[in-house]
């Protein structure tokens, strides 16, 4: 949520700040701004709306001229989207950009008003800026440390002091921030894509570390002023991975990247056709002794966890609880040192998931994180980390990250089933081999694109949709429904097909399309019966089915037959048409597919 960039070097700062912010648009935002040292003063340009609005404003008024600056894209939390609430905030002495939430801003604001300060905006960020100004005594490090001792909440801050025109100061707590290291130029950013065109090398800031960035040096300190020497990280993905590469949207590109993403994710964890998590410190002997397994996540990652629950319980015969992170952490869960907590987060920065992980660690449980971003907060805190190798996922609506998360859940299930004696080596090897073949089947599913586009054309005028399925198909329906509502803005809900008669069927009319999923042979007859129920009440039905399903004429209006795969692995295949239907529905409605309204890619506040 929100994006921060900062630059100091020999080049003009404004174009680099704007370019960096453009690479962070996927994080979601409603306003943008930059601040640049311009002939001894800090000049600020900011406005409500898209980055293009800011560019237009500067084309009319002139860009700030200077070699040091900070920039920000804002996703409103305190105060509505407006020019005045946009970042940067500050005064002639101190200017800042901020991601996160200052929880005690009201108390601090009242104090500052009592000291004679006035406020132009409704934001908590302006409070932090004025507090920095209040305590400033000519020593930025001392001032920042004092302010950190006063504020409560989460933050990533980029700070400029007028008295130090060659420097940017950066600090973080519970909100991601990196320091990019180039040749005679250095950067700060919320995420790697903002700097990847300029450098691959960066430092990860830890909690309450303060970075002092000049064009030829980066120094990092703790709040007591002690210098910290950190390991330099190098981004291991290609610059082109953050570009569309000829596709109309990042989402479509990322759908097409799924076969390769799955290969990169599973192959390092397979040895001699058997799952192998030894590099991650996953101990099979300990694995079989856990009393309970909890999978905790948010949004799409939680839906991947639902697939994990079904397959682990089915083949490993271990009870699994899947919980929404924001619910888990507040319900006093019964988790102990005998349990395993698996958290899933693409960014590794999801605030509620991170808090749930911390709760599990306090209870003494072992923790495993499935994340896509190396060195992220969740990755650094978990006992065991499984990195997915999806590469950068730019579109807000997750596709390839979901697919690789599921692929890891399968390998964990196979490992657990083998450790528990529920699978012998031959059967475990057979399933692992089938998983290795899934990327090719995903390719075949992507080839159904034109059928999915046709189905989407029949959905664009709907006000509401219903997704139904049973078992693994119900878990899939949850993700399909989320994808559609995220980017098409059409209301949709997912329901277990067997629950229709318990109330939901009252909503069925000719105006409500139904997307049904039937990939599990043992449940097909029941699902078809449910489809007939909605069809008899006038629903337009799109059926996504396994290839051998014998379907009577008239049961569904559109049938999308999937390529052949073992039914246990069908979620990885059936997810593709669900993604494509959502994508083309949004495209046909003329929506901004990659940056849907009100959404952020990385939800770093609670």
What are these regions (language model features)?
Residues 288-437, 517-560, 581:
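Glycine-rich phosphate-binding loops that contact phosphosugars or nucleotide phosphates
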Residues 1-244, 248, 263-267, 271-291, ...:
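Conserved short alpha-helical segments that host acidic/polar catalytic motifs at enzyme active sites
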Residues 225, 540, 553-555, 565-606:
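Generic C-terminus detector
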Residues 258-262, 266-294, 384-513, 589-606:
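Active-site phosphate/pyrophosphate-binding segments
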Residues 7-10, 98, 118, 134-137, ...:
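Hydrophobic alpha-helical scaffolding
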Residues 124-127, 304, 308, 404-409, ...:
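Catalytic-loop motifs flanking and including active-site residues across diverse enzymes
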Residues 49, 67-84, 272-284, 308-344, ...:
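Glycine-rich oxoanion-binding loops at beta->alpha junctions
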């Amino acid at each position: 949520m929100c994006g921060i960039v900062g630059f100091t070097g020999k080049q003009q700062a404004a174009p680099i700040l704007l370019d960096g912010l453009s690479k962070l648009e996927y994080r979601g935002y409603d306003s943008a701004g930059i601040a640049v040292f311009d002939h001894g003063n800090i000049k600020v340009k900011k406005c409500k709306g898209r980055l293009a609005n800011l560019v237009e404003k500067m084309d009319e008024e002139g860009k700030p001229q200077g070699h040091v600056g900070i920039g920000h894209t804002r996703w409103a939390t305190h105060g509505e989207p407006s020019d005045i609430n946009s970042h940067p905030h500050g005064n002639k002495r101190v200017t800042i950009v901020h991601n996160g939430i200052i929880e005690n801003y009201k108390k601090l604001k009242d104090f500052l008003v009592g000291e004679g300060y006035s406020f132009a905006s409704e934001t908590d960020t302006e409070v932090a800026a004025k507090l920095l100004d209040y305590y400033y005594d000519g020593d930025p490090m001392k001032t920042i440390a004092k302010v950190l001792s006063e504020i409560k909440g989460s933050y990533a801050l980029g700070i400029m002091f007028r008295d130090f025109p060659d420097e940017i100061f950066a600090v973080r707590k519970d909100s991601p921030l990196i320091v990019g290291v180039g040749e005679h130029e250095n950067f700060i950013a919320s995420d790697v894509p903002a700097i990847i065109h300029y450098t691959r090398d960066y430092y990860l800031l830890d909690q309450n570390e303060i970075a002092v960035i000049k064009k030829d040096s980066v120094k990092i300190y703790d709040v007591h002023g002690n210098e910290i020497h950190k390991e330099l990280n190098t981004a291991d993905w290609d610059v082109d991975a953050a570009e569309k590469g000829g596709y109309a949207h990042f989402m479509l590109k990322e759908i097409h990247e799924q076969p390769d993403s799955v290969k990169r994710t599973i192959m390092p964890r397979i040895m001699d056709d058997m799952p192998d998590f030894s590099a991650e410190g996953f101990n099979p002997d300990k694995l079989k002794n856990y009393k309970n397994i909890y999978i905790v996540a948010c949004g799409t990652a939680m839906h991947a966890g639902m697939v994990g629950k079904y397959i682990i319980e089915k083949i490993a015969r271990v009870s699994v609880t899947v919980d929404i992170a924001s619910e888990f952490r507040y319900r006093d869960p019964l988790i102990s040192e005998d349990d395993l907590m698996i958290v899933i987060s693409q960014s590794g920065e999801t605030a509620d998931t991170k808090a749930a992980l911390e709760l599990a660690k306090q209870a003494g449980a072992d923790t495993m994180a499935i994340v896509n971003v190396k060195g992220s907060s969740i990755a650094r805190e978990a006992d065991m980390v499984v990195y997915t190798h999806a590469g950068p996922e730019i579109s807000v609506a997750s596709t390839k990250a979901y697919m690789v998360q599921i692929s890891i859940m399968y390998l964990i299930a196979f490992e657990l089933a083998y450790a528990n004696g529920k699978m012998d080596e031959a059967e475990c090897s057979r399933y692992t081999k089938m998983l290795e073949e899934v990327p090719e089947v995903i390719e075949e599913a992507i080839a159904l694109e034109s059928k999915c586009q046709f189905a989407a054309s029949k959905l664009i005028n709907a006000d509401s949709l219903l997704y139904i399925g049973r078992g693994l198909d119900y878990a899939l329906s949850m993700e399909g429904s989320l994808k559609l509502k995220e980017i098409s803005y059409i209301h949709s809900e997912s329901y277990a097909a067997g629950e229709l008669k318990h109330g939901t069927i009252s909503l069925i009319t000719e105006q409500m399309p139904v997307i049904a999923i039937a990939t599990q042979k043992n449940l097909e007859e029941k699902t078809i019966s449910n489809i007939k129920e909605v069809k008899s009440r006038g629903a337009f039905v799109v059926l996504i089915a396994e290839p051998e399903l014998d379907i009577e004429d008239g049961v569904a209006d559109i049938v999308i037959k999937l390529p052949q795969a073992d039914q246990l692995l069908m979620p990885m295949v059936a997810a593709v048409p669900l993604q494509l239907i959502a994508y083309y529905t949004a495209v046909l409605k003329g929506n901004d597919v990659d940056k849907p309204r009100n959404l952020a890619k990385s939800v770093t506040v609670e």
